[in-house]
Design a protein with these regions (language model features):
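A conserved beta-strand/loop element that lines the FAD pocket in flavoprotein oxidoreductases
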Residues: 2-14, 80-83
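A glycine-rich dinucleotide-binding beta-alpha-beta segment and adjacent secondary-structure elements
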Residues: 8-24, 29-30, 174-191
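Core beta-strand elements of the Rossmann-like FAD/NAD(P) dinucleotide-binding domain
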Residues: 33-44
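Extended, hydrophobic alpha-helical segments in both membrane/secreted and soluble proteins
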Residues: 42-45, 65-72
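Flavin (primarily FAD) binding-site architecture
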Residues: 47-60
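An anion/pyrophosphate-binding glycine-rich loop and adjacent beta-alpha core
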Residues: 72, 78-191
């Protein structure tokens, strides 16, 4: 531990923020190891609980990102800001939601619609697949909403991230885990 002026509590699930006279007074939590309910008294609180990405049906977020920290802050009367913004990672395996690293696009992967078009040409002709996440995410949604996506399971339509043109050697050297994930969880070999 680099700093000694705090104590770290792993395997605790915070449940409530205690506010007294409009000031932070403490926090309640459950010790996940033994199930005990614990009260922490304090003078200050930093909330770093992640977002709420798991609220969406298809997401690359981990199972723990359910908005509990945001809800806890809201219940305590703390102001929340910019709640309409949720950062999405634009590429994941359908239907599992396993994240496919942006490195796959960085190494030269193409986003293609069901007609085989590299549709990023319409939205970010200079940056193409290397455009920022928000642009890539909106572009994918536009393609799907306008009927150019692939029909997926349970109405979960999608586009393709095509790596085949990179060749086996480059994929095995630069993206071996992506190949392994695609084979194991999507039944597709990108080479």
């Amino acid at each position: 531990q680099r700093f000694t002026n705090y104590k770290r509590y792993d395997e605790f699930f915070a449940t409530s923020i205690i506010v007294k006279n409009n000031k932070f007074a403490g926090l309640t939590a459950i010790d996940l190891v033994n199930g005990e309910f614990v009260l922490f008294i304090g003078k200050a609180l930093i909330i770093a609980t992640g977002g709420a990405g798991r609220l969406y049906r298809f997401t690359t977020y981990s199972h723990s990102v359910t908005g509990d920290g945001l809800a806890m802050a809201f219940r305590a009367g703390l102001p929340l800001k910019d709640m309409e913004f949720i950062q999405f990672h634009p590429t994941g395996l359908v239907p599992s939601g396993i994240l496919i690293t942006e490195g796959a696009r960085g190494e030269g992967g193409y986003l293609r619609n069901r007609f085989g078009e590299r549709f990023m040409e319409r939205y970010a002709p200079k940056m193409m697949e290397l455009a920022p996440r928000d642009i890539v995410s909106r572009s994918i949604m536009t393609e799907i909403e306008e009927g150019r996506g692939f029909e997926g399971p349970e109405g979960l339509d999608y586009v393709h991230l095509d790596l085949t043109h990179l060749g086996k050697e480059k994929i095995n050297e630069r993206l071996p885990m992506i190949r392994e994930l695609a084979i194991k969880f999507a039944g597709a070999d990108p080479v």
